[in-house]
Curated annotation (Swiss-Prot):
Protein name per Swiss-Prot or TrEMBL: CASP-like protein 1C3
Family: Belongs to the Casparian strip membrane proteins (CASP) family.
Residues in compartment: Extracellular: 28-52, 101-130
Record organism: Populus trichocarpa
Compartments it resides in: Cell membrane
InterPro entries the UniProt entry points to: CASP/CASPL (IPR006459), CASP_dom (IPR006702), CASPL (IPR044173)
């Protein structure tokens, strides 16, 4: 039987794994052909370095998340997992920040630089990018919750304390 602490950690890791995998698949398959006046073009994630970085970072975290599912809770490797959770959470945050900046320019354009918005011409592509970013945000939020929970349980086990109660009986 799985311990309740391990069950919560496992559930959070499964959610994070699914979200990063979804972000990779959605972004990597995003493409659409469009035209603007007489110009024909194809919008795809691989044309943008920030989107490639997003896919690569999420793929790395997906593999890590899958492997972390199989580490026993009694293993001394959990200290390393805690440190890697922090590193990979920061990696996800940096990749989504870069991708979100490019997506914003694609949606709104930048009149100062003379960049026109493209989402009016390639709406399917922009919707796929938005879906990938939403999945990425779900992964980040899940990893932050997982990180906080892991730190909490690690410190409690390190200090030999049980979680404190917020209220006393009879109050």
């Amino acid at each position: 039987m799985v311990k309740p602490k391990r069950l919560l950690s496992l559930l959070l890791r499964l959610i994070a794994f699914g979200a990063t995998l979804a972000a990779v698949i959605i972004m990597a398959t995003s493409h659409e052909k469009g035209s603007f006046f007489a110009l024909s073009y194809e919008a795809k994630y691989s044309d943008t370095p920030a989107f490639k970085y997003f896919v690569i970072a999420n793929a790395i975290v997906t593999v890590y998340g899958f492997l972390a599912l199989f580490i026993p809770s009694e293993s001394p490797l959990w200290r390393l997992v805690l440190a890697l959770d922090l590193v990979f959470t920061m990696l996800l945050i940096s990749s989504i920040s870069a991708a979100l900046a490019v997506a914003q320019v694609g949606k709104k354009g930048n009149s100062s630089a003379g960049w026109l918005p493209v989402c009016g011409q390639v709406t399917k592509y922009c919707n796929q990018v938005t879906g990938a970013l939403v999945a990425g945000f779900i992964a980040i939020i899940t990893y932050i919750i997982l990180l906080l929970y892991s730190i909490y349980t690690f410190l409690n086990s390190l200090l030999g304390k049980t979680p404190c109660r917020l209220s006393s009986p009879g109050i």
